[in-house]
């Protein structure tokens, strides 16, 4: 990850409006991972990541920042909800499964990268195997044994290879030997995922090396053989070692809904999924060793980013030790009407662009006028103020309601409007949403 903080923020700005403080914090944290790797080994071990707590109402961009960060980082990344975990000893998932999932994500990411790297070699090997299955039908008895042995360079083989690449043989059926799959689906009870994974690995290893002959169309066989050849070219042990290092040195964990496990006031009871979960998170964030399929993973240098709306609780309701392990606090601001308007216009693949392109597939063209988007933003803000504030997610509800009739009758409208676009202006928005927005009872249930 060699992007500078300024470049990271610039990339995040393409997708997320506002929230500059949060973007700067995650950009610095991400850049610090790269800076740490440039240090001498003895000093590198001492530099630990500064974990982040993002505080802000729902729908302002906390989760979206995490999603975009995952794509930018090119590092093992996992997003989890704190509410899915229970204290050790109770039925449910314990927090150590976060690191096991992160290890799985790292292995999957590196395997995909390695398969891309060996793709051309795998394709060549797969083509050779398909041609070996095809060519006995093309040979004639007058060929000598020597000629058959050198058929790899023969004109016939080259001709078949050309036709195979052009897709002319896709529907031809061949018989080919492929690895026998011993995958077994096991329904895991809550908290037993690790044991289930081990059982599945056991069954998979039992079937390793077994092969069976199958009749397939060339197109299906080529894909199956290509995947098999790519898997054969990938060194699994080397891959696991790389994945282990990637998790320990570059891993990022995003814990959403952290406010839902905060203890609110003096609530009695067992508090299984609240304070117990927080206390289980402490060693994970501080640094401990977790057993995974890659081996023992040290969590000392994994970056943790926690986020929560904190509507019904405060950050101070978290246990003090957990507060201390999340030293960087970032507050995300509630969205203004201007923010809503920018969200509709500016981001790459904005909501309006998505609807425009979706309807274009039916031959229907729609255009959003600036005053129409401004009015839509005002209504979104008003409804959020009057009812529950769900942030930018309100725009999804409003746009779906606004374009409901157009989406339903898109095919008919396309034939009547020909190439003339439908204009979504302020008058159109008012006629479809104005009354609903003004009536608080209606907007509470419909918008």
UniProtKB/Swiss-Prot annotation:
Amino acids binding ATP: 17, 59-64, 256, 321, 393
* Gene Ontology CC, one term: HslUV protease complex
Keyword Transferase listed? The answer is no
Question: Short name of one Pfam family for this protein?
Answer: AAA
For this protein, what is any one GO molecular function term?
A: ATP hydrolysis activity
Compartments where located? Cytoplasm
**Which GO BP terms sit in this record?**
protein unfolding; proteolysis involved in protein catabolic process
Does the keyword ATP-binding belong to this entry?
yes
Q: Which domain of life is it from?
A: Bacteria
Keywords of the record, alphabetical order, are:
ATP-binding, Chaperone, Cytoplasm, Nucleotide-binding
Q: Enumerate the SUPFAM superfamilies for this protein.
A: P-loop containing nucleoside triphosphate hydrolases
Give the family from UniProt: Belongs to the ClpX chaperone family. HslU subfamily.
Q: How does it assemble?
A: A double ring-shaped homohexamer of HslV is capped on each side by a ring-shaped HslU homohexamer. The assembly of the HslU/HslV complex is dependent on binding of ATP.
Q: What does this protein do?
A: ATPase subunit of a proteasome-like degradation complex; this subunit has chaperone activity. The binding of ATP and its subsequent hydrolysis by HslU are essential for unfolding of protein substrates subsequently hydrolyzed by HslV. HslU recognizes the N-terminal part of its protein substrates and unfolds these before they are guided to HslV for hydrolysis.
Q: What is this protein called?
A: ATP-dependent protease ATPase subunit HslU
Gene designation: hslU
